[in-house]
């Protein structure tokens, strides 16, 4: 059985999110995007392996689906705690950019919820033993769309704003 829990000492993105408190200052981390991309790759790898075993023991496969959903939830939490505050600070003075960021963030929330809902639908299909392949395809598409959108829009925006703000602080 897969274990998705990582040590905080491992430096993984999930460890960073687990150690945050209300008093933790959120700062730009140039390595965070790479960590998140690595975590997304691991999630995709695990889901692809799971998809090849859909005809196996439904209880085990369902547990693996739940583990994938938990990993996606932790990735989403990391993004919400570490990426979005940096981006929000970067667009705070520009009302148009702020509105576009809110729209982008709502869109990403919708994609994440859709992916999680597809994982739930796959778990239900496994329990019922019907339409498992279709549910797995839908979950794979939702997961892929969420990742592609993050890598195309959120992560570059975080890097751009974080590097720009880091440069401004060095000049000052």
Go through the PLM ranges and name each one.
Residues 1-172:
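Small-residue-biased structural context
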């Amino acid at each position: 059985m897969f274990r998705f829990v990582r040590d905080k000492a491992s430096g993984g993105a999930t460890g960073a999110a687990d150690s945050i408190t209300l008093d933790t200052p959120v700062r730009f981390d140039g390595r965070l995007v790479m960590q998140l991309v690595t975590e997304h790759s691991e999630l995709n790898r695990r889901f692809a392996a799971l998809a090849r075993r859909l005809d196996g023991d439904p209880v085990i496969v369902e547990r693996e689906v739940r583990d994938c959903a938990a990993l996606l939830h932790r990735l989403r939490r990391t993004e919400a705690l570490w990426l979005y505050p940096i981006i929000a600070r970067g667009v705070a003075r520009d009302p148009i950019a702020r509105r576009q960021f809110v729209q982008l963030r709502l869109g990403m929330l919708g994609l994440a919820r859709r992916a999680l809902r597809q994982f739930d639908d796959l778990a239900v299909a496994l329990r019922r033993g019907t339409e498992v392949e279709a549910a797995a395809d839908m979950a794979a598409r939702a997961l892929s769309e969420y990742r592609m959108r993050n890598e195309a829009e959120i992560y570059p925006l975080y890097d751009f704003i974080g590097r720009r703000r880091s440069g401004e602080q060095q000049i000052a």
